[in-house]
A protein has these predicted regions:
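The feature encodes the CheY-like receiver
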Residues: 19, 64
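Acidic, metal-coordinating helix/loop segments flanking the phosphotransfer/catalytic sites
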Residues: 38-56
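Acidic catalytic/metal-coordinating carboxylates
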Residues: 41-44, 67-70, 91
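Short amphipathic alpha-helix used as the core "switch/output" element in two-component signaling
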Residues: 47, 69-81
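Active-site residues of response regulator receiver
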Residues: 60, 88
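Short, flexible helix-to-coil linker/hinge segments that flank and couple to helix-turn-helix
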Residues: 94-159, 201, 212
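Helix-turn-helix DNA-binding segment
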Residues: 141, 147-182
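Recognition helix of helix-turn-helix DNA-binding domains
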Residues: 169-202
Length: 213
């Protein structure tokens, strides 16, 4: 229950229906949780937030088109008291830092134990900040100056570089992110410039040295 003695209303935002269903079941095992809406993209997430006014919105970062971080920024712009928990596969400090800068109250990596999702939702609903241990460690390392040259990349550039390093073609990346292959190619060129790479192969080698895999 929240401070008012009623169930914590949760909005789930992830572009994979099966994943949302799993989170839905996990959260509603707790009688103090009620999933009031689900969304698969930024536009629907913002509309659901407006209609249902959840206590906590749980957002994935890698949404098609507009990212979860930009979605969080827009939610907070529309509703200043929005409480957002980012729930993402990305454990890097840069993602967490930019999520908090966008207005998120918590950041949980999908590598975390399932029970941490319930704990994180409760914490954010109470108005406190939550960071999963692995992400907290990455943030501490970043604060100590260990984030490296990769910090110059935008969130979208990080996503694209990870997918390139995993062997995806430009068209495949575009399909996953909801953008054209040309847009991905433009991002690739910008990434090469920032990392000092002169070819696609060199870019992959540099990325792996930076820990992308």
């Amino acid at each position: 229950m929240n401070a008012r003695g009623r169930a914590i209303k949760v909005l789930l935002v992830d572009d994979h229906a099966v994943v949302r269903q799993g989170y839905h079941r996990l959260l509603e095992r707790d009688p103090a949780m009620q999933v009031v809406a689900e969304a698969a993209n930024s536009r629907d997430a913002i509309e659901c937030d407006r209609l249902f006014r959840p206590d906590v919105a749980v957002l994935d970062i890698a949404l098609p088109g507009v990212s979860g971080i930009e979605t969080a920024r827009r939610m907070v712009a529309h509703r200043a008291d929005a409480r957002i928990l980012m729930f993402s596969m990305y454990q890097d400090a840069i993602y967490a830092s930019r999520a908090f800068a966008a207005g998120a109250r918590g950041y949980l990596s999908k590598a975390s134990a399932p029970e941490l999702l319930v704990q994180a939702v409760r914490t954010v609903a109470d108005g406190r900040r939550f960071v999963s241990p692995d992400v907290a460690e990455a943030l501490a390392a970043s604060a100590a100056g260990a984030s490296g040259v990769g910090a110059s990349l935008s969130v979208r550039e990080h996503e694209i570089l990870r997918l390139l390093t995993s062997g995806y073609e430009l068209g495949e990346i575009g399909e996953r992110l909801g953008v054209s292959a040309k847009t991905v190619a433009n991002h690739q060129s910008a990434i090469k410039h920032k990392l000092g790479a002169t070819s696609a192969l060199q870019l992959i080698l540099v990325a792996r040295q930076l820990g992308f895999n």
